[in-house]
Amino acid sequence: MNNSSMKSFLSKYHLQLFFFAVALESLAANFAHPITPTLIQNLQLPDYSFGMLYAGMAFTNFLFSPFWAKQVTRMGSNRVLGICCVGYGIGQLLFAIMKTLPTIMLARLLSGFFVGGIMVSFLTYIIHTSTMENRGRYLALSATFTTVFAAFGYLIGGFAGVVSIPLTFALQSGVLILCGMLFAICLREDREVTGRSVSIWKEANPFQAFLDARRFMTLTFAVLFFAVFLTSTATTAYDQNFNYFIKDQFHFNSSYNGMLKAVVGFISLIANTTICVWIMKRTNVKKSVIYVLGGAGVTLIAITMLEDILPFILINIIFFALNAIYIPLLQDLCASASSAEHSSMVMGFYNAMKSLGMIAGALFAGFINAAGPRLSFLYAGIFFLVSMLAAIWYYRRSGRNRENA
């Protein structure tokens, strides 16, 4: 295949190659998750280390997401993904090598810095290279691939960790670096062509990147981002408590964890490729998201009242489906509300609010669990209901704006 044929092939199949690389990255990103508790125990680190390291990675993800959104505009999603996947791979190698809590925290902070760029670029590439008609479907597909292959990555990491923890980290880093090469080579150019010469280091101040959000921020956007923050907080608090709860309350052994991850992945696949796509094509997303968020809140509150295993699992399955659906719906709302000029910054801010919710949810679950094992579910349900109220306000505000236009 000559150079011209290769370029033609990459141009024609860039989205298929993008989703293949997304699946591979989501797979590799989760190899280390099931072995992290074992690594912490082997190093005799304090019990709070797991939550602290998770929050550390989420913190730099949050802090630098708007920064990476600006770099997407300058360099293009393909280059940012290439840089960030390689950087993430190096961060995970350092995670495996370090032996003390402070040095491991530095490795996690480094990984979080690059993960922010990956998450932002996933969204910006879809927005920049798809039509308005296909954007919602592709966002749902991206969310599906991320969730489903994360579950399989968790399973693979668990099995590989039994053989060797260093081998698992080496495998993870190798696949992440491979993903970086695929993204850099196979994706279409989507950077903004400008005559300005801008230094990346001059823009490296993450707080300036947040201040630059004033270019697009309105009260309507602020309420939408508040809903993103609340839902991310709720989902993270739920996730952090769920595995501990089923082991503590129902005495499930550790083998059920991988099985449940696989079930979650399968449910997400079905929900996103059927219900979510139907909502985006056939309904008003601004209105439909209200019912999805409300349903998620009600199911979580119902979970706190269930004592038997079977009803508990069934209601959780309903929540898994709703939890899978709301993410691409909120992504689509943020993308639809942004102009072409500010789309990268908007999605960067979206990822920042999602990451901030991850930090808040992890810390909240850690503290509230001591007061009661079901309280994380209860408050996560309340957070979803409050986000539903924010979605109602957003829907009504949008309706008034159309009438006044």
Residue ranges and their predicted role:
Residues 340-371:
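A late C-terminal transmembrane helix in Major Facilitator Superfamily
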Residues 2-12, 190-224:
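Juxtamembrane intracellular "pre-TM" segments in multi-pass secondary transporters
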